[in-house]
């Protein structure tokens, strides 16, 4: 995300933030790919409160104040009946995305709230959200009981022509409980068949599915009132744009840990995708990246500890529970059964063994190598220097203290360019594939290694003011032929750099169209106004600006289109900014 992070003790004295440390005393811009984060704040099992708390009622009003005010939100939206209907739809989708718990009769009853959720946010009277959730929890209990009972029935003979529609996003709600019974019978039979095709025996299948359904019920039973509140307020926040989010106090406390959690274990960021956990992003330098066997969109269906032994089915699990299984002691082994992104969910998974590790800074640093490319017709071979840059990193504290050896992507690339020049390479390829971004300053200064001063990016704020950020240093570190390699995982800072190189005609952009995220987010602490010693209200991440290329066009949605396109590795319709239904449109200034 291109995020301007902001905490209650900060001063407006800078414009970058570390991807390793989301909280910083600097007014910061974090240019990384979007990270989906909506998980239970802790593992508690206390009963769900019957009503929201007084602090939650106040927090809802504070969120409304931010998201409806053009001084804060880049694209404020009036909280009216139209937005209430959008919230209603999103809240139901967040609870029951596969339409497997609620009936059409339930929805007809909930429709009384359709035009009232805006009033609930404004007034802090949040009972409608809790009432809907109470019904949801009841329906989950009913379905879990029904599914477990089916496992002991003689329904697992597959000689007919039954069909089960796995993707239920566009199907209507089941008319009543009888229709849901039919749906769940098909679903359980499908789950059984998938395990049978994977080679499991009936007793093993029965045990696996019984545990899966029981875990699903327990997971929902453990949800707390703050989980309900966060999901409901996010139905409002996400209706504004896909990168606007609300975090409860506990979720906000864990927000800073979320990046480091992903950096231990296998080095991958995960997200929930229907009833499975999928890989959202591969962290450079980690076990997943080094294995070259995983990619964004791959789905994890089972986890095993050690090099051999039992594989634990994790379909239907909460994302935090799956993460807990994947993480472990550095040096230990973890096995994953993974269904590739391009395969159907019913496909046989691949077994991948990874050694858990913690990513070291040096493993994320820029690296170079020289490739010798044969030339035809008796011409001499070409020597091409390849620089791999996994992130636009910077040691912000070291830079602030003016340390001589602080970590910096630009400084490292400059050093590598000097070495490659000494090795008399004929051209340079800068590899930004799966580079999710990092520091805006680094993106600008890195561009300056290849151009002799000039604008690099334009930033338009919510009030319409446009600032131009550019390279002011004279001199070029590399004047020879340049190519920049990108793919769908190249986002934000990578897109700023690649776009500038393309706009200046300084080099060729090759690969795939990039991610397409061209917005700026700000993390606002809701406790900064009451100046609470203990957090009570949480935080809001909201979009406050949009960035534009030197040529005036945005990277939003469209991304950076390569001059020379390679066959795509990830379906653009499944991954990227354009997959969000309410992403900001492309525009230019």
Mark where each language-model region is:
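PDZ/PDZ-like domain segments forming the peptide/carboxylate-binding groove
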Residues: 93-94, 115, 129, 134-145, ...
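Conserved functional hotspot residues or short segments at active or partner-binding sites
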Residues: 198-211, 550-589
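Bacterial N-terminal signal peptides that target proteins for export
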Residues: 8-9, 13-27
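Extended, domain-scale alpha-helical bundle/helix-rich regions
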Residues: 142-265, 274
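Cleft-lining beta-strand/loop regions that shape enzyme active-site pockets
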Residues: 45-52, 70-80, 84, 218-225, ...
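Bacterial N-terminal signal peptides
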Residues: 28-36
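Sec-exported extracytoplasmic/periplasmic mature domains
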Residues: 64-75, 88-100, 115-126, 134-152, ...
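Polar, glycine-rich mid-to-C-terminal structural blocks
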Residues: 505, 510-575
């Amino acid at each position: 995300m291109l995020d301007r992070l902001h905490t209650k003790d900060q001063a407006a004295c800078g414009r970058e933030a570390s991807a390793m440390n989301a909280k910083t005393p600097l007014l910061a811009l974090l240019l990384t790919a979007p990270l989906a984060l909506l998980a239970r704040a802790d593992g508690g099992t206390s009963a769900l409160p019957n009503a929201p708390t007084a602090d939650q009622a106040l927090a809802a009003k504070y969120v409304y104040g931010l998201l409806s005010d053009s001084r804060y939100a880049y694209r404020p939206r009036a909280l009216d009946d139209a937005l209430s209907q959008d919230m209603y739809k999103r809240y139901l989708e967040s609870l029951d995305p596969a339409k497997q718990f609620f009936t059409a009769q339930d929805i007809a009853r909930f429709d009384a709230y359709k035009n009232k959720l805006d009033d609930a946010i404004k007034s802090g009277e949040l009972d409608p959200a809790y009432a809907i959730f109470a019904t949801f929890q009841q329906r989950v209990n009913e379905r879990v009981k029904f599914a477990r009972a089916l496992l002991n029935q003689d329904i697992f003979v597959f000689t007919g022509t039954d069909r089960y529609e796995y993707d239920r996003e566009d199907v209507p709600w089941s008319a009543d409980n009888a229709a849901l019974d039919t749906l769940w019978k098909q679903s359980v039979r499908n789950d059984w068949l998938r395990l049978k095709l994977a080679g499991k025996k009936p007793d093993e299948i029965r045990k696996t599915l019984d545990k899966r359904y029981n875990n699903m019920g327990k997971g929902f039973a453990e949800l707390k009132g703050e989980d309900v509140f966060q999901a409901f307020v996010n139905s409002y926040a996400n209706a504004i744009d896909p990168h606007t989010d609300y975090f409860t106090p506990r979720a906000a406390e864990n927000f800073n840990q979320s990046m480091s959690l992903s950096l231990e274990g296998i080095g991958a960021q995960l997200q929930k995708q229907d009833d499975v956990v999928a890989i959202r992003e591969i962290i450079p330098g980690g076990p997943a990246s080094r294995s070259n066997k995983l990619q964004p969109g791959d789905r994890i269906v089972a986890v095993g500890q050690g090099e051999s032994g039992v594989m634990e089915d994790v379909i239907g699990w909460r994302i935090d529970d799956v993460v807990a299984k994947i993480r472990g002691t550095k040096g230990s082994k973890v096995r994953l059964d993974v269904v590739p992104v391009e395969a159907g969910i019913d496909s046989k998974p691949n077994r991948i063994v990874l050694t858990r590790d913690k990513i070291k800074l040096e493993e994320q640093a820029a690296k170079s190598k020289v490739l010798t490319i044969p030339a035809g017709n008796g011409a001499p071979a070409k020597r091409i220097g390849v620089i791999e840059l996994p992130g636009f990193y910077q040691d912000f504290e070291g830079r602030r203290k003016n340390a001589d050896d602080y970590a910096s992507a630009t400084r490292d690339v400059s050093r590598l360019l000097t070495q490659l020049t000494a090795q008399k390479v004929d051209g340079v390829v800068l590899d930004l594939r799966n580079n999710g971004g990092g520091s805006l300053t680094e993106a600008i200064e890195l561009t300056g290694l290849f151009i002799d001063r000039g604008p690099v990016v334009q930033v338009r704020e919510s009030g319409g003011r446009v600032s131009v950020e550019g390279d002011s240093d004279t001199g070029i570190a590399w004047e020879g032929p340049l190519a920049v390699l990108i793919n769908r995982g190249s986002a934000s800072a990578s897109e700023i750099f690649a776009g500038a190189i393309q706009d200046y005609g300084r080099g060729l952009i090759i690969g795939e169209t990039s991610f397409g995220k061209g917005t700026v987010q700000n993390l606002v602490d809701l406790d900064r106004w009451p100046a609470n010693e203990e957090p009570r209200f949480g935080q809001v991440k909201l979009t406050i600006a949009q960035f534009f290329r030197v040529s005036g066009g945005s990277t939003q949605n469209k991304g950076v289109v390569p001059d020379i396109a390679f066959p795509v590795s990830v379906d653009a319709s499944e991954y990227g900014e354009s997959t969000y239904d309410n992403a900001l449109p492309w525009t230019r200034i």
